[in-house]
């Protein structure tokens, strides 16, 4: 009987030791993350040199200043700013889903309420998509203006292994990429940066106020984008 108890006790202690070993290993993995400031700088440099991207933008919460619920499309700033895709927006108090849009020569064309695509007006009156890739106003500038940045985890986003970084983004950087938000203070920010290669930006999220987020998920960096301007 004593031998059996000894065997059970030994098995129990072995299991405890193994669990302790696993916990220690997980802790060491969690602390073995790249330096946040260095990774942000590397990603900012990469982003600053990019001229096209596939973008998925989503918002949560009440955001009257930016009436975009979601937007997905291709964007380029070479040779000029142009974009094409679909968006869900609130227009005149009515939610319009999956509305086709084109941005060309500074103008926004869209198919409102199922109509044929037509000229709406200056794109910047709704949202200046050209700001996203602008080296001084866009995503690169957002990455360069993180403070209190910390690498907190490794996560897979769009099948890309990323390092998740949290911190604050300066009000100036937020207002440059989205002037409609008109924030007064630094806001919560999270960036998911590719763990390898040129450390491309995979996703970024801004929290202009409690319960409100703007998330951009990015892919196909550098892929050629051709946008045809609709007939007037």
Curated annotation (Swiss-Prot):
Protein name: Lipoarabinomannan carrier protein LprG
Lipid attachment residues per UniProt (N-palmitoyl cysteine): 22
Topology in the lipid bilayer: Lipid-anchor
Designated gene of the protein: lprG
Extent of the signal sequence: 1-21
Entry superkingdom: Bacteria
Function: Helps membrane protein MHAS_02168/C731_2106 (P55) transport triacylglycerides (TAG) across the inner cell membrane into the periplasm and probably ultimately to the outer membrane. Binds TAG in its hydrophobic cavity and transfers it between lipid bilayers. TAG probably regulates lipid metabolism and growth regulation and plays a structural role in the outer membrane. Also binds mannosides, lipoarabinomannan and lipomannan and various glycolipids in the same cavity. The lprG-MHAS_02167/C731_2107 operon complements the vancomycin sensitivity of an M.smegmatis knockout of the same operon.
Family that this chain belongs to: Belongs to the LppX/LprAFG lipoprotein family.
């Amino acid at each position: 009987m004593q031998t059996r108890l000894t065997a059970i006790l030994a098995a129990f202690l072995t299991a405890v030791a193994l669990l302790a070993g696993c916990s220690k290993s997980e802790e060491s993995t969690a602390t073995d993350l790249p330096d946040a400031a260095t990774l942000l700088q590397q990603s900012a440099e990469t982003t600053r040199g990019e001229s096209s991207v596939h973008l998925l933008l989503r918002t949560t919460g009440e955001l009257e200043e930016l009436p975009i619920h979601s937007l997905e499309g291709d964007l380029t700033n070479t040779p000029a700013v142009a974009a094409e895709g679909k968006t869900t927006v609130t227009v005149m108090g009515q939610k319009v889903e999956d509305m086709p849009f084109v941005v060309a020569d500074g103008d926004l064309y869209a198919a409102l309420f199922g109509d044929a695509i037509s000229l709406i007006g200056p794109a910047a009156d709704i949202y200046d998509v050209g700001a996203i890739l602008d080296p001084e106003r866009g995503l690169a500038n957002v990455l360069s203006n993180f403070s209190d940045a910390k690498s907190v985890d490794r996560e897979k986003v769009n099948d890309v292994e990323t390092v998740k970084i949290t911190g604050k983004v300066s009000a100036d950087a937020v207002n440059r990429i989205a002037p409609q938000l008109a924030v007064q203070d630094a806001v919560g920010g999270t960036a998911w940066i590719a763990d390898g290669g040129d450390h491309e930006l995979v996703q970024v999220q801004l929290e202009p106020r409690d319960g409100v987020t703007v998330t951009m998920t990015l892919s196909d960096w550098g892929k050629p984008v051709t946008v045809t301007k609709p007939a007037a």
